[in-house]
Amino acid sequence: MIEPNYLPFILIGGGIIFVVLFFHYVPFFLWLSAKVSGVRISLVQLFLMRIRNVPPYVIVPAMIEAHKAGLSNITRDELEAHYMAGGHVEKVVHALVSASKANIELSFQMATGIDLAGRDVFEAVQMSVNPKVIDTPPVTAVAKDGIQLIAKARVTVRANIRQLVGGAGEDTILARVGEGIVSSIGSSENHKSVLENPDSISKLVLRKGLDAGTAFEILSIDIADIDIGRNIGAALQIDQANADKNIAQAKAEERRAMAVALEQEMKAKAEEARANVIQAEAEVPKAMAEAFRSGNLGIMDYYRMKNIQADTSMRENIAKPETTFGNEPLSK
């Protein structure tokens, strides 16, 4: 049984706990702020938000902002559903208010769809009002005269809200602009015409409709800078000349090797013929002896042949060139 002396303290403690729980589950001051702002919402609805794990401090300020901006068609249930789907309620309401003030057509369904697709819908609306400037990386291209040009461009784009869901992003814009610059410079007769009229590149690229299928609308393309690079044509000609020279040297080396091989083959054949001659000369004494035995060769015939051999040897010695050793001529 509770002592009478402790009863006031228990009642005070219970009252404090009740007040804390009440203000936790029922944000009274938030409800009061909504009432003052003209937003119709009950304490029961705020309590049910807590039960559904929907923070009232996200939904109610968004409702107040929409009501003050004249967007009375946005309901509490729609905001709760968008929050529970993982969306950003504050950004969606900010975007709708900005679009309404800028006379941009944007419905709640479109805004929530853009937000759930992972796009920043508020930034998209801001970009529709204030176009964004994108600087392209250096684009390298070669004119028909072989001179390399390095161009930098600035692309002014505006968000196309209707294409934000499923439309390509900035990377696609940069890639298409770079492709257009390369095509424009590559079709120029010489690099001087590009340097004299850089706006011709912008006009040609804009006519191609590079923003088709993207989340942006290209407003202008301005060539910020053009630098002259290497002489690619001359470099290619030098490389081709070096390649032709290497091929000619390889063919000449091949012909030289074939000539050396043929020379060695001829030397081998000459040595073979010389060996055959020596072998045939070795058979001469045998034939002469056989001729003496058979009586086909007489003594006078033998001496006559020896005289002929001596004359032949003398002529060969006379015909041989003299070699010198120091100042003394030597005969082999």
Swiss-Prot record:
Membrane topology designation: Single-pass membrane protein
Major place of residence: membrane
Cellular compartments annotated: Cell membrane; Membrane raft
Signal peptide limits: none
Keywords, sorted A to Z: Cell membrane, Membrane, Transmembrane, Transmembrane helix
TM spans (from-to): 9-29
Similarity field: Belongs to the flotillin-like FloA family.
Subunit structure: Homooligomerizes.
Name of the protein in question: Flotillin-like protein FloA
Organism: Phocaeicola vulgatus (strain ATCC 8482 / DSM 1447 / JCM 5826 / CCUG 4940 / NBRC 14291 / NCTC 11154)
Phylogenetic classification of the source organism: Bacteria, Pseudomonadati, Bacteroidota, Bacteroidia, Bacteroidales
